[in-house]
Structure formats: C-alpha cells, structure tokens
Amino acid sequence: MEALVYTFLLIGTLVVIFFAIFFRDPPRIVKK
C-alpha cells in the first residue's frame, strides 16, 4: 500500500515539474 502512495507522489511531482516547464517555455512545435 505504501508503494502505491510513493508511486503516486513520484508521478505527481514529475507532472508538476513537466507542466511548470511546459507553461514557462511554450513549445515551438505547437504554433497557435
């Protein structure tokens, strides 16, 4: 059960970092 919690926290941290970088530096691939 603890492993599931740690995995959830790890994925959540990675997602937060990903979105922080994504919104800070707009992707050059998608041009609107």
Swiss-Prot record:
The chain crosses the membrane at residues 3-23. One of its GO terms (biological process) is photosynthesis. It is a single-pass membrane protein. It holds the Pfam family PsbT. Keywords: Chloroplast, Membrane, Photosynthesis, Photosystem II, Plastid, Thylakoid, Transmembrane, Transmembrane helix. Its main location: plastid. It comes from the Eukaryota. SUPFAM superfamilies: Photosystem II reaction center protein T, PsbT. It is found in: Plastid, Chloroplast thylakoid membrane. The keyword Cytoplasm does not apply. GO terms for cellular component: chloroplast thylakoid membrane; photosystem II reaction center. Belongs to the PsbT family. HAMAP family: PSII_PsbT. Found at the monomer-monomer interface of the photosystem II (PS II) dimer, plays a role in assembly and dimerization of PSII. PSII is a light-driven water plastoquinone oxidoreductase, using light energy to abstract electrons from H(2)O, generating a proton gradient subsequently used for ATP formation. PSII is composed of 1 copy each of membrane proteins PsbA, PsbB, PsbC, PsbD, PsbE, PsbF, PsbH, PsbI, PsbJ, PsbK, PsbL, PsbM, PsbT, PsbX, PsbY, PsbZ, Psb30/Ycf12, at least 3 peripheral proteins of the oxygen-evolving complex and a large number of cofactors. It forms dimeric complexes. This is Photosystem II reaction center protein T. It comes from Emiliania huxleyi (Coccolithophore).
